[in-house]
């Protein structure tokens, strides 16, 4: 039997004048295709289940799955859990006192520590506490603490508040002294986030200083407003 439905179609197909119609599957061939697709779907579902299985799930599968495969997945899952634990280690702005400064800050190893020296009654200190509370929840791999300035450093001048110190392995690796460089009372949480990123205290997605971004947007808005005004003036002149 030819590839076409008629002898004429067979000739045209032979000389490349037309394409052969798709082959009609027999009932057995169709059944085999459906069976193969079902087996592939089952295998994919099984692999996904193994990848997402908890340690308890993996233990429950011991009688049904290859032990070497389960052991590899178990090790992989434990490593994932360790990484997740490190990335979610903290998550809050914790107030500490002078006796605990050493253990909470200078003796803290392998972790970035952000320390806010503050004093009650200073509005900008309150502002920084608000911003750091937000950032602590966002960057849980970094330790955020606050301490009254008079407890951290005796006779520390109020004119230097708020002060943010960044520690790593007991050393100060970054600092923000007052909010003069970040806009004073207008300092935003993004401004603080950018400064902490510059000190490598956090892994932020910010690509540039928020003040530069804001200045550019204001400049663009000003240009658009001027262009609209000029266009309006020209329209009035035409009238």
UniProtKB/Swiss-Prot annotation:
Q: Which GO terms describe its biological process?
A: asexual reproduction; protein folding
Region entry Disordered, spans: 42-64, 212-239
The entry's keywords: Coiled coil
Residue ranges, compositional bias (Basic residues): 214-224
UniProt biased composition (Basic and acidic residues)? 42-59
Region named Thioredoxin fold: 90-239
**GO cellular component annotations of the record:** cytoplasm
CDD domains from the xrefs?
Answer: Phd_like_VIAF
Q: Which InterPro entries match?
A: Phosducin-like_chap/apop_reg (IPR051498), Phosducin_thioredoxin-like_dom (IPR024253), Thioredoxin-like_sf (IPR036249)
Q: Where is the composition biased (Acidic residues)?
A: 230-239
- Listed Pfam families: Phosducin
User: Which ranges carry the Phosducin domain?
Assistant: 36-196
> Which ranges form a coiled coil?
26-87
Under the heading PANTHER family, the entry gives: VIRAL IAP-ASSOCIATED FACTOR HOMOLOG
What does the sequence similarity comment in the record state about its family? Belongs to the phosducin family.
- Any idea what this protein is called? Phosducin-like protein 2
Look up and give the organism this protein is from: Dictyostelium discoideum
């Amino acid at each position: 039997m030819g590839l076409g439905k008629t002898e004429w179609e067979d000739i045209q197909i032979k000389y490349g004048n037309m394409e052969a119609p798709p082959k009609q599957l027999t009932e057995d061939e169709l059944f085999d295709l459906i069976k193969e697709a079902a087996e592939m779907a089952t295998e994919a579902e099984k692999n996904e289940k193994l990848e997402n299985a908890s340690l308890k799930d993996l233990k429950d599968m011991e009688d049904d799955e290859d032990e070497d495969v389960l052991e590899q997945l178990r090790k992989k899952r434990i490593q994932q859990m360790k990484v997740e634990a490190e990335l979610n280690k903290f998550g809050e702005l914790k107030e500490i006192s002078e006796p605990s400064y050493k253990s909470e800050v200078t003796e803290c190893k392998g972790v970035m520590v952000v320390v806010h020296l503050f004093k009650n009654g200073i509005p900008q200190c309150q502002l920084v506490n608000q911003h750091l509370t937000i950032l602590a929840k966002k960057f849980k791999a970094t330790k955020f603490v606050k301490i009254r300035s008079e407890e951290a450093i005796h006779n520390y001048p109020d004119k230097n508040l708020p002060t943010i110190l960044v520690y790593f392995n007991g050393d100060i690796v970054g600092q923000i002294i007052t909010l003069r460089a970040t806009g004073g009372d207008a300092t935003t949480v993004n401004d603080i986030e950018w400064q902490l990123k510059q000190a490598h205290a956090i892994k932020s997605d910010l690509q540039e200083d928020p003040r530069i971004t804001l200045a550019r947007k204001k400049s663009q808005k000003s240009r658009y407003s001027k262009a609209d005004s000029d266009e309006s003036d020209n329209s009035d002149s035409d009238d």
